[in-house]
Amino acid sequence: HSNLRRQRQMCIRDSILTDHHEMETNSTFFFQPGVKSRTHPLTSKANQDLTKKIAKYHVKNFDNNGVLYFSGERFDDFFYGKGSTFPDINGSIGILFEQASSRGHIQNSANGLLPFSKTIKNQLIAGLSSLEALVELKEELHKYQLDFFKNSKKESNNYKNEAIIFGDNTDSYRVNKMAEVLLRHEIDVYKLKENITHKKIVYSLGNSYLIPKNQKKFKLIEAIFDKRINFNDSLFYDVSAWTLPYAFDLNFDMGVTNFKLGEKLQNIKNKKYKKVVDNAYAYLI
């Protein structure tokens, strides 16, 4: 599901991507923008301004249908690993919808009886209001996306001689799995031409890769490797960090300047490992 959605966005460059969810029964309906102080610093003001403009369409349609709703509170727009925020770092507008759940056919809630049919109707209203915004704000959305990639390219030009390096000399499998994720997101990854020692860490051929910063996915690359430890707000609804190489327990650095690019990586061929004995009494790792 998430892979198909991501592949579609890579090919089509959605202007708006809506992410429909459910929350606890005694709530109403939420739509973004979220809490202002919990928006990721790499997400532009232009993105949030457009999100607010689109929100006016939800307000109008919910008011016309007598639907209770809220916005600008509780939920944040920080973690790029979720469906409503990932588009924001890829030139689109991601919008989260949260509908109070009926948890089945019908349920009593603080706001009265909540039937399943009503929850579906509310999500439909939100979807249709998004389409209405898409049509009426077409030129603004198109310009926003063009500007996003123009500005990203312009910013990446400041790093023409800089690259990110990552690797692990003890486990190429984890390194390759990280590289697979990057390739799926159309990020240019290169093999090393020679071993590189950087900040007393040796990155060896076959166990390490280089990512030139000067490429079209500069903003996404920045988000993936960003080591963020300072926050405007101490509260989070979701996840506060997304430094992907830590998930693979890899060495990495974002500021390598003395390097030679090897062959461009096209696909990953993982080593074939011997099958673990099926009927073993125990395993020693």
Show where each model-derived region lies:
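Intrinsic-disorder/low-complexity accessory segments
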Residues: 25, 31-69, 73-79, 83-285
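Single conserved hydrophobic/aromatic residue that forms the stacking wall/gate
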Residues: 1-12
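Histidine-centered catalytic micro-motifs
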Residues: 15-25
